[in-house]
């Protein structure tokens, strides 16, 4: 269908790698819809040419920054300010209906059935389920809606300093009016939710259609071993509880995206791709040899407590589920 599209956004060359993997995963699962990507002037001309190979339409837009630095600081994610550029997706009136997907999402199955949904359809946010997560949503492009969103952005801003707060303010009836607009969680499976509700993931995770790599560390920031075809563990990263989704991301990246980047001179060759700052200062590593063992520094109980309170628990080490269970067992005996 030429009047419907999957839409994503990249504001720099680092996120463009995510967009390339997303687009490749949509094609891999044989979508019949067009693919469009919004880019900002910060995306290099060379990377834009690479995007044009995967996407049917590459559209440059001006950055609309919320400027809400206090809220962004509170969220510890100041880069989210520029994601208000997502509002431009409502101006794509050449399409009758679209599905927006963040560049840090990955498609695991055909999801063309999302176009049967109405605006605004989205999955609950794992942090506050009465709000929807704006990483995946169905919408209908409209100049009127676009202008109304700009007005809300200007007059009210965003309660979280990013696009999700603004969109939840605008579509404020999502939580209560129509359950049909609540997408199942499998259409926007948060990678950080896997650890927090492991039993549900074990029961339903096999049905996941889209995984969303929330958090500061993105798939392209990890180290990948081409021999084992697996991502190296990163200490207390909860995403590594079930790294299979990261491995799928990297498999698509190495087989479909790296050759494209090589074609445009963004990387020289696979063998020299270890520890190379290939695009816009963002490092993607391919570990071609032995992965050196790392020793974890000693952390006092007070430091551990402080890290817990800041949401930085060592999920893969001292604060793993098995270690917590052992500690609880000593008290219950």
Swiss-Prot record:
Reactions accelerated catalytically: L-tyrosyl-[glycogenin] + UDP-alpha-D-glucose = alpha-D-glucosyl-L-tyrosyl-[glycogenin] + UDP + H(+); [1,4-alpha-D-glucosyl](n)-L-tyrosyl-[glycogenin] + UDP-alpha-D-glucose = [1,4-alpha-D-glucosyl](n+1)-L-tyrosyl-[glycogenin] + UDP + H(+)
Binding site for Mn(2+): 102, 104, 212
Site feature location: Important for catalytic activity: 86
Alphabetized InterPro entries for the sequence: Glyco_trans_8, GNT1/Glycosyltrans_8, Nucleotide-diphossugar_trans
GO cellular component: cytoplasm; nucleus
UniProt keyword list: Acetylation, Cytoplasm, Glycogen biosynthesis, Glycoprotein, Manganese, Metal-binding, Nucleus, Phosphoprotein, Transferase
Sites bearing Phosphoserine, chain numbering: 44
Subcellular location: Cytoplasm; Nucleus
Effect noted on mutating residue 163 to N: Loss of self-glucosylation activity and ability to trans-glucosylate maltose. Reduces UDP-glucose hydrolytic activity by at least 190-fold
Pfam families documented for this protein: Glyco_transf_8
Modification note: Self-glycosylated by the transfer of glucose residues from UDP-glucose to itself, forming an alpha-1,4-glycan of around 10 residues attached to Tyr-195.
Tissue localization of expression: Detected in heart, skeletal muscle, brain and testis, and at lower levels in kidney.
Entry keyword Nucleus: yes
Co-factor(s): Mn(2+)
Pathway: Glycan biosynthesis; glycogen biosynthesis
Chain residue ranges for the region called Interaction with GYS1: 284-316
GO MF annotation list: glycogenin glucosyltransferase activity; manganese ion binding; protein homodimerization activity
Residue positions binding UDP-alpha-D-glucose: 9, 11-12, 15, 77, 86, 102-104, 133-134, 160, 163-164, 215, 218
Similarity field: Belongs to the glycosyltransferase 8 family. Glycogenin subfamily.
Complexes and interactors: Part of the GYS1-GYG1 complex, a heterooctamer composed of a tetramer of GYS1 and 2 dimers of GYG1, where each GYS1 protomer binds to one GYG1 subunit (via GYG1 C-terminus); the GYS1 tetramer may dissociate from GYG1 dimers to continue glycogen polymerization on its own. May also form a heterooctamer complex with GYS2 (via GYG1 C-terminus).
Function: Glycogenin participates in the glycogen biosynthetic process along with glycogen synthase and glycogen branching enzyme. It catalyzes the formation of a short alpha (1,4)-glucosyl chain covalently attached via a glucose 1-O-tyrosyl linkage to internal tyrosine residues and these chains act as primers for the elongation reaction catalyzed by glycogen synthase.
Official protein name in the record: Glycogenin-1
Species of provenance: Oryctolagus cuniculus
Gene: GYG1
